[in-house]
Amino acid sequence: EPTQSLLLFGLERLREAGLGSLPGGGAEIFDDRVHDEAYQNNVGEAGWFDVHRTAHEIGMFTNATMLYGHVERPEERITHMLKLRAHQDASLASRKASFNCFIPLSFIPEGSELSQAAGPTGLMDLKTLAISRLMLDNIPHIKAFWIMQSAKLAQVALNFGCDDMDG
């Protein structure tokens, strides 16, 4: 398939130039309703997984993200994590690399096209991080992104399943 060949070619060139891993942004929520409502201009689930599957096949580790607290429902967050878990299982079984880290990202409504959204609460942040650790036990690291959650909440998140902080 031409698109897959171009993707493989591009990732191999980037790796040869020194790129060691991919950050994993752009996943948003793996749900057609959410994608159509809020992220029509983004790559979408199939494209996102194509990039990561190809990277894993050539030995490049990646991270995975989930942007939550906007228009998605709790069950759509769970489905997102289940899809990541299934992909990670496949990567661990048959590829040279896999996801190294999962980073749940709190949606910040201010200044966005979804500014009417309430955004996540601190409790939602902690629940999401804890559920992530339980559901994604096949991904080595769960990261609290303190820029979006505050430094104090990220510190608490270290007791809710996170083993890393960034920001």
PLM regions and their residue ranges:
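Glycine-rich tight-turn/loop motif centered on a GG-T
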Residues: 1-5, 34-45, 114-119
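Glycine-rich phosphate-binding active-site loops on the catalytic face of alpha/beta enzymes
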Residues: 164-167
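Conserved C-terminal portion of the radical SAM core fold
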Residues: 10-27, 46-113, 122-152, 156-159
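Glycine/Thr-rich phosphate-binding loops of Rossmann-like dinucleotide-binding domains
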Residues: 30-32
